[in-house]
């Protein structure tokens, strides 16, 4: 990231730093299908950072969860909790060697999914486990929240065609959007960039990606909003 101006992901994109230093630890968040991992990988390539990525397909309960949430909700949730906690622990152990990272999750969001997926007794058990883990997650220097409508999420999920996600329904995505919006309405744990992702194509549009990176490089504190329609 010191002097890097060219990235290579699926294509070469020029990013002009203009003397600006990227945030050291960036976390990208948002609902299912919004493009978290795509953006995290692109930012990591731009700044020559290491990625810290969720591995949803490693969760053996997830496909059954999307078909019938009640039966395996707790197992699905605990698997993700342990996976995220392990990734954070591994990150802390290697931080001295690789201090610059981009993650496609924020540890504090884990209870959001638990709140909408678990019944009361299950949530109490989940919360005990969560508290016992005492996860000392490092604070990001910037959180990027990708926000998109349910229609856009459904379209992107369909377009990427993952078999594991075929059973995701509109109602579930609407509820997820609600809890994400509420969470980030009050979030003050790190500088926050809220991105209107409805009309932005970070996967395929070089211009959209460059506009976003140019905007986030100037952020040092506070809450910011990126609406790509303002740049056109």
What are these regions (language model features)?
Residues 1-24:
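Extreme N-terminal, non-catalytic leader segments
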Residues 28:
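Hydrophobic anchor at the beta1->P-loop junction of P-loop NTPases
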Residues 36:
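Conserved lysine of the Walker
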Residues 72-138:
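Glycine-rich phosphate-binding loop used to anchor ATP phosphates in small-molecule kinases
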């Amino acid at each position: 990231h010191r002097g890097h101006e060219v990235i290579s992901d699926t294509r070469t994109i020029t990013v002009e730093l203009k003397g600006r230093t990227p945030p050291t630890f960036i976390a990208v968040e948002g609902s299912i299908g919004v493009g978290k991992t795509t953006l995290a990988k692109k930012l990591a390539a731009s700044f020559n950072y290491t990625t810290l990525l969720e591995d949803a397909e490693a969760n053996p309960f997830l496909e059954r969860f999307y078909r019938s949430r009640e039966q395996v909700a707790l197992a699905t949730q605990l698997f993700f909790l342990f996976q995220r906690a392990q990734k954070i622990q591994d990150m802390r152990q290697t931080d001295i060697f690789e201090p610059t990272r981009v993650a496609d999750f924020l540890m504090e969001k884990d209870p959001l999914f638990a709140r909408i997926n678990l019944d009361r007794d299950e949530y109490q058990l989940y919360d005990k486990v969560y508290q016992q883990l005492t996860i000392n997650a490092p604070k990001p220097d910037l959180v990027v929240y990708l926000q998109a409508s349910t229609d856009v999420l459904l379209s992107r999920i369909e377009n990427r065609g993952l078999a594991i996600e075929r059973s995701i329904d509109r109602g579930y995505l609407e509820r997820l959007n609600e809890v994400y919006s509420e969470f980030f309405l009050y979030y003050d744990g790190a500088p926050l960039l809220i991105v209107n992702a409805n009309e932005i194509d970070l996967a395929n549009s070089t211009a959209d990606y460059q506009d976003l990176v140019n905007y986030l490089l100037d952020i040092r504190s506070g809450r910011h909003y990126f609406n790509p329609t303002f740049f056109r």
